[in-house]
Structure formats: structure tokens, C-alpha cells
């Protein structure tokens, strides 16, 4: 067992040394008050200074009036997972201000709306009262707009206190509002008012600040839903059937915008796509399956409640072998749960979705780049294996902005799998829709409209034989189910392999997937630097697993599966896959609805190590 030491106390002489480019800022406002634009400007300004950043929006499941928090993390080491400790608070919401202040760690800074009178709450914080209403009045004559514009004042105040480059703030604002000259001028004047007030009344914040670096050159800021939508377009999607649901709606909206731009016949001006907002998620999947059967590249997107409704049609697509892509941007459950909080809670329900024996292909992106590349790959896999393929994102990855390298133009053609043309049918002289010709479990198919007498077949969700004829014979049913299992085994060699980061000295292994990846990177450094515990790491990128997983677990003394759900769903799947070594596998679970953080992972692993 690894030796665990108590972390040494920080040198008191360093307690007031200004920390540069390593801080977390939380803005507490009211939903619908216009703070999103101000927060985006602040995030982008720091990003444009060359400092690695991430933004996390914790918002309520209503349109306006309830508390919302936006956290910006800047870190010179490139750590972009959520950090629990807040170093600077902007308190704009009277309902939560006192609790927000009491939750801060010592020596934090607080900018607050002056009437809230927070200064007396704690003596170990630095307070900066700002008269927002007084400052916004001369900047914005229209009283109806003041509640929106006033948020830009705290951008200016923070620019002074933390040394955010004002020129970069101006560029960021221009990127946000450049197409609206009046709004641009109005908001810039509000930022200037905040800067001027802060310069006249406050010293720089002595504990934290930012300074220009060169670690974001060439990178972009983008959310996972937008990246996935771009991937779907490059994959050739022409049919989107969907039903609105948080947090996946923005993905569909992005696909629709791109279709309007790029799926129009240049000669006629007519649309070459179909978008259907269905009456519910079940209907949406039914439409997508019909389109996939007809030969279109079709998709739907949803979240956990929609996945529950889609079970019956998913089983149909699996059994009759129709390609379709389903993007699940996961949120908390069960039932309505917390619609605007994140979780990785749909893994077990999705991999086995439907009644009877079904096992589905799941792709598990951990970055916006993989949201892009895996959404493309999902369509290829769906057609190659003639089956539903699920892309499993989550709210944190899908709706928050992340740093990323520019998305690369695809370098390989679309792969449609085993599709027979009329010429193929004429040459082979025989076609049996569900026959395993090649031994890989994947049959050949034809598309409606193929002009050959052998091409048509009847697609049925009831029992069928190799010729697609109705059959209740036990041998036909068993033969079909065995072939479907062979097809799934073949998929092990085709889905994205896990990424393994080895350490020759490691006895402890960590397994994770999806957006948890970023907290894992930081937690591994914490374990090594604070406790001298080296770790190896395997990041699962798809189901079904390949042999890399078994080999990884076999090499380790103990393996911790880290995930964001209560029941350790991925851990159970890992234990099934490595049943000979399942006693090595332990579970680290996080399920508050907030994105997972490194310290939670580190502390839980250390606790389990101490307990044996």
C-alpha cells in the first residue's frame, strides 16, 4: 500500500504573496439578468491574454429570476476542471450573497452591490462595495436596459483589481457584440465606468491577479454541443428529428443553423435536408429510424428522460439493423431530476437500452475536439454496423465553453458500410438480408429505390430468418441473436480504443471517461506531488471495451473507476469485463450535479487507500 503523508502547512510568509494566473472567479447573479454576456467577455479577455481558462455555468431550470453562478478558472498549468475553492466572488444576488460569502475560503476577494452591505460578515476577506445602480444610470439612459448593462460594470472593476488587460476586454466585447454598434458602445461605456470607479477607489487585489502568458495561441473557445453539431454536418447528416430538452437543445439548434447555411441546393435554392420537431422523443427517434432505413444519414439528440422514452424504438433499430445516431447530452436523474445539472448517469440504461438482449455502441468524448470527431465517427459506425450508435456527452461538456485546438477538416471520405447496388446484386445473383456472409456478424443491405428484383425485403421487428422472412423457428431466432452478438464483438476492433498513460512505478490505476478526464489529469498531479503516489491512467473512449482494459487492470494492484453518478455504473461494466481481476476494481463516485473536481478525486482515493 502507498505511504500517505499529511501535507505540510503552507509557509505563513507566503500567505500574502500575490498568486498570478492561478485563481477561480465566481459571479453570482440572477438568471435572465444579462450576466452571460458579461461573463463571456471576462472569460475571453483572460483567454486572449494567453492564459488557460475554463468557464462553468451553474444555472437554474427556469427562464429568469432564480440564482445562477458562473465560475471562471484561470490556471497557468492548464488545469481546466472545476475548482471547488473560490478566490474571488462577484456578489450581485441578494438572495444568495450572504451564503456565497460565508462559503469562501479565507483571504478571498468580494466585489458586491453596495446596498447588500456584506462587509461586516467576515474579517478575513477583502471587500469592494460598488454602487452599480449609481454608475449605470449616466451610462444607460434607458432604464429598461440598465439591469442588463450593469453587469458590464463588474467586468471593468475586475479588470482593475486583477490586472485584466483592458484592450483584450474590448476585443472580447467586440467579438460578442460587434454586429450591434449601439449595444457595443453602451456596454463598453459600462466597462469603462467600472474601471474608472475601481481606479479611484480601490487598490489592486493583493492576493490574486493575472498576467499575460503564451499558452492559448492558436486555440479557440467552443462548447461541446456546437462542436458536435459541426461534426454532424461534416458527417453528412440530412435528417434531424428532435424534441427540445435541456441540455441538448442547443445542439439541435446549431445543426439547424448549419443546415440552413450549407444544406441548400445552389441551383434551386431548395433545402436538401429535413428537420422535424416531433411531438416527443419517441416519435423523434421513430422518424430518424425511418430516414436511416431509407438511406439518409439521420440523427436525434436528447438527454436522459428522452433516452427512457426511446427504449422501444432503439430495440427496433437494433433488431432490424437500421443505422441511426443518438446524441445523449446527459443531465441528472431520475425523472426530471435537476435539468440544468451535469451527470454521467445514463451509461447502464443506454448500453442495454430496450427489452431483451441488446448491447449498443457508445462513444464517450472527453473534449470538444472529440465531440466533433466522434460525432462524425458515430455516423460511419452506425452505417458500418447497421445499428444505433450513441454519442454520450454531458451538460458540462456540451453547454460550457472549453479551450480547444481548431477543429481539423476531415481527411477521409464517408464510409457507408455494406450497401449493395443494383450492379452488385446482378453480379452475385443472390441476396439474403440477414445472412452473415463474411463471418463478422454484419450482413449486407440494400437501400429503397435500388432498381433490381433482388433488392426489396421486408423489415420487421418480429422474428425473422436470414432472408428477412417472418419466422418463429427457434433455430432462426437463435441464429439471428448469435449473429448480432458477433457483430458487437466485431465492433470491439473498430470503436475508438482507450487512451493509456502509463507510469512504470505505478501500482494504482485510474479509469475514467468523458468530461471527468480533466479533473483526473489534475488529481494525478496532486497524488504525485503531495503524496508521492504515481498512477497510471486509462481513459475509456467507447463501448464495447477492447483487450486494453483487461491488460491495464491486470498490471495494477488497485484500480479506481472515477465517474459522475451514484451507483458506479461504469465500474460495474468494468468489473464484468475483467471478472478475473474484479476484486482490484474500486469506485470513486461524484453526484452533486456540479462538475467533478480534482480534490474530490484525490481525497477519495487517499481515503480508500488508508482504509485498505
Model-identified regions with their sequence ranges:
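Metallocofactor- and cofactor-centric catalytic cores in central/energy metabolism, strongly enriched
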Residues: 14, 71-75, 88, 92-93, ...
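Flexible, glycine/charged-enriched surface loops at secondary-structure junctions
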Residues: 10, 56, 168-169, 181-189, ...
